[in-house]
């Protein structure tokens, strides 16, 4: 009888330890997955921001070129008006 009680207690202990181990492993896996997703999103946002920044720089350069061209045309018109 004593043997059966001990065996039953060991089975319960084994079951509890197995549940704790499985739960801990699952939690660690979930945390690891969360961190990987968080890093992937951070990298994606950084890539998008860098791409948009590059596009804005290009647009600013194009606008500066257009502004310079317009300034040159205005100066030409002023010179022509001054000559008349």
From Swiss-Prot:
Instruction: Indicate where this protein resides in the cell.
Output: Host membrane
Instruction: Give the record's membrane topology.
Output: Single-pass membrane protein
Print the keywords alphabetically. Answer: Coiled coil, Host membrane, Membrane, Transmembrane, Transmembrane helix
Q: Which residues cross the membrane?
A: 13-35
- Report the superkingdom from the record: Viruses
Keyword Transmembrane included in the entry's annotation: yes
GO cellular component terms, semicolon-separated: host cell membrane; membrane
Claim: Transmembrane is one of the keywords in the record: yes
Stretches of the chain forming a coiled coil according to its record? 41-84
What is the official name of this protein in its record?
Uncharacterized protein 84
